[in-house]
Amino acid sequence: MTTVDAPVLVGTPRWVRPAVAVLLLGTAALYLTNVAISGWGNDFYAMAVQAGTWDWKAWFFGSLDPGNVVTVDKPPLSLWMMGLSGRIFGFSSWSMLVPDALAGVGSVGLLYLAVRRLSGPVAALLAGALLALTPVAALMFRFNNPDAFLVLLLVAGGYFLVRALENASTKWLLLTGVAIGFGFLDKMLQAFLVLPAFVLAYAVAAPTSLGRRVWQLLAAAGAVVVSAGWWVLAVALWPVADRPYISGSTNNSVLELAFGYNGLGRIFGQSHGGDARPKLPEFPGAEHGFGGQAGLTRLFTQQFGGEASWLLPAALIGLVAGLWFSRRAPRTDRTRAALLLWGAWTVVSALVFSYMSGIIHPYYTVALAPGIAATVAISATELWRGRAYLAPRVVLAVMLAATVAWTFVLLHRTPNWQPWVRYTVLVLGVLGVVALLIGTARRVVAGLAIVAALLGMASFTVATAATAHTGGSPASGPQSERKGRVSFGGPQQSNVELNRLLETTTTKWAAAETGAMQAAGLALNSGKPVLAVGGFSGSDPAPTLAQFQQYVASGDIHYFVVAARNGRGGPGGFGGSRGTSGKITSWVEQHFPATTVGGAKVYDLTQS
């Protein structure tokens, strides 16, 4: 064979284009309406976006300040997008968050295109709708964390792989590698979680010889390395004295950050780079890296359940059933190829998220959403096509029953929020299951089943979009769902008096403060550059004491600020009083006078 069996592209019904338009416009409305409600979102990344609108070098490296002392602890791809928007439209909450919302619309559109080519427009529309209506998707596509662009690039990679599967195209497979490589530049090794699924689907179903499949996959691996490696190489070759310190690394290296703090450290529990380890237990509930105990049930816990698990049971049931029913199909069967791609995406990502022992946030599961959405849509559509037989109807009924039962449990966790929703879901779900089992397989039954399956999840999604989200660990769903959630890095209470003081400065940095989570509030509220001593948590050795002393001697920093920490440990909120940042603070306290400005202790570094 020279092509995957019968790509579903011919004879598209007239209703499809209007339906796609409704899907994309509805997604845009959901993600863009009042998008600025969250203000600066995660102040840490907002500070870097702001710096990128001031200085191109800061934009390229993802620096926290235009003086390029230290970067964020992630690669800068998402900051590039938000920074360009800020340069075009002016830096604001709106200009920063709109690119993330558009990434969401693009992800839904690309998922539709990918599923349509192998499974037809009905499955494709359903997959797009399921992704759009996943609560954690609405959360992250309206927020400024890197995850929005990660999902866009991963779904783009899935689309390119589907195109490669159709006729064993090397070009499309190389583009798959490029998409994953750029995903690395957004969130490092998390982008590689889909690689097992991509390799499996292509190795099994590509319509060409085994030898050609192998060398094509090796070429695609090369594309990953090149598209990810150019920026890594640029940073490595850039003179160290002329670039910012790579936050989170132990030796100022992007590769060490990728395989250390942002790689194996996330899997096995290593905490942080720099010269002082953050003390996560200083945040109540953060003893297990913000994600609770690792284990097979993690994705169904109070912390994770409401994010992306709504359809996970149905996806697993549909995947197993779909693979069983297609077991005798030709190697290049399109349905099995699609299930291998999206199903393996779901299973591998779910297992990794479940067993990570390091830092993990519930919103990471947004990377699961495309796999779950596509797997459910494809398996449900194929089972519906076989509804004349008992076995497919039984599997559909089980998928629906599992979804309704799990939705009821999730909604019951917020008993005071719209209780009518969970009971409506239960009633409609029971009716749908009964109708499927007795063989009343009409379109009205399909509609009933879809409403029952999606009503609870969609309600959570609407609640998510209507609520402001701030800090480093945002959560989806109604406000009551967040009780007990661990968060940090949210907006600091604005010190109006201090902001006015900083606005009068003309130095390179208006002020310096330990830890980006505190310094970001000063920079964003005053509109002036602020040096985040020690990077994200105050634990990075940047600047060194000698460098800081040179900045002060050169008149580059006007003030050093020590704000109240609300009982959260040392400067920066992660015990940043140790290490290099602690030495800098001690030196300032010994050599400069302090005054109190709006409750903050402020040292004037121009007076000694």
Language model features: what each stretch is:
Residues 44, 48, 76, 80, ...:
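Extracytoplasmic/secreted proteins, especially bacterial periplasmic and envelope-associated proteins
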Residues 207-208, 546-549, 576:
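Short low-complexity, flexible loop/linker segments enriched in glycine and/or proline
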